[in-house]
Amino acid sequence: MSKPRTRVAVIFGGRSNEHSVSCVSAGSVLRNLDPERYEVVPIGITTEGSWVLGSTDPETLSIRGRALPSVDADGSALALTADPTRSGDLVALDDGEAGKILASVDVVFPVLHGAYGEDGTIQGLLELAGVPYVGPGVLASAAGMDKEFTKKLLAAEGLPIGFQVVLRPGTATLTDEQKSRLHLPVFVKPARGGSSIGITRVAEWAALDDAIAHARLHDPKVIVESGIIGREVECGVLEFPDGDVRASVIAEIRMPEGAGDDEAFYDFDSKYLDDVCEFDVPAKLDESVSDEIRELAVRAFSALDCQGLARVDFFVTEDGPVINEINTMPGFTSISMYPRMWGAVGVDYGTLVSTLVDTALARGIGLR
């Protein structure tokens, strides 16, 4: 008798400004979950926050030209019950079916990027519901989403970070003293965002206030970081079902000559639409530098109390590696660096997502 398949809910979309990136990531996950091992239940979250039963066809979640996918409200409306005695039950909400159990899932893969998904919110719901899930828990997800607290935790562990100033709601701009501690260029960012959305490179102070206003379109709390001169690299961290935590090879992102001017950086269009960046996987670094980055990545993973996976971004400077940020649910598109880094060491995409699901099931539920 064949072993029953594990029922995996893949959740995507969401209310954040990274809605479309989440959809594309989920399409790649759907494409690579082994149908002999897993029965997939796709759940889309609209930009308004409604949960609907999605399509199992990954092509519906693909980028077409420069058109990005999104979740519409046409599917059957549903909700995940937060009652742990009904762990994993997905309940219909539509008239005539309200209360009917549409499916009961064994584990959730929350392929959500940004606010209301990657920031500890859905992780809290899944903890209440008593459902195992892929990725870090509530604390690590919340801290990893907020660049202020990411760096506070990293600094507390003695890990190398750059200088930043936090502008909370009600604080309009930098003081002269803060400007003197920063050095141009600076990067102005939403404190709780990803995919390089809302980020501006500021080369002169006259442009600062416009950059802050732009970032505040996405988050009332803003980070201003000193620009760091160095090579931009990334390292993936993966937890296995036995609890072993490993780091991937290092990848380097390069803006090729002719792709832009001195102000070019790895922004949203560069990542997902324009195909102008060049990547070295593995990066062409001295072995000792690569080993140091891998060690720092695992230490950063531990500093935030992550589980499952994370991608740690660095600058390699003349004085050594500096951690830029941690992404607790990195992109899973076909061109995303996290699966590419693991693919370079023989962990193909299908094996990667299976490992993540198996690790979530091994971890179980409750305090740990």
From Swiss-Prot:
Q: In which pathway does it act?
A: Cell wall biogenesis; peptidoglycan biosynthesis
Q: Where does ATP bind?
A: 179-234
| Cofactor binding note from Swiss-Prot or TrEMBL | Binds 2 magnesium or manganese ions per subunit.
User: Where Mg(2+) 1 is bound, by residue?
Assistant: 313, 325
Sites where the protein binds Mg(2+) 2: 325, 327
Q: Tell me the GO BP annotations in alphabetical order.
A: cell wall organization; peptidoglycan biosynthetic process; regulation of cell shape
Q: Where in the cell is it found?
A: Cytoplasm
On whether Nucleotide-binding is a keyword of this UniProt record, the answer is yes
* Reaction catalysed by this enzyme: 2 D-alanine + ATP = D-alanyl-D-alanine + ADP + phosphate + H(+)
Q: Which UniProt keywords apply?
A: ATP-binding, Cell shape, Cell wall biogenesis/degradation, Cytoplasm, Ligase, Magnesium, Manganese, Metal-binding, Nucleotide-binding, Peptidoglycan synthesis
Q: Which GO terms describe its molecular function?
A: ATP binding; D-alanine-D-alanine ligase activity; metal ion binding
Gene Ontology CC terms: cytosol
The record ties this protein, via SUPFAM superfamilies, to: Glutathione synthetase ATP-binding domain-like, PreATP-grasp domain
Q: What is its main location?
A: cytoplasm
Taking the record's annotation, the residue ranges forming a coiled coil are: none
Q: Where is the ATP-grasp domain?
A: 151-358
Q: What cofactor is this protein dependent on?
A: Mg(2+); Mn(2+)
Q: What does this protein do?
A: Cell wall formation.
Give the family per the record: Belongs to the D-alanine--D-alanine ligase family.
Protein name, per record: D-alanine--D-alanine ligase
Give the originating organism.
Rhodococcus jostii (strain RHA1)
Which gene specifies this protein's sequence? ddl
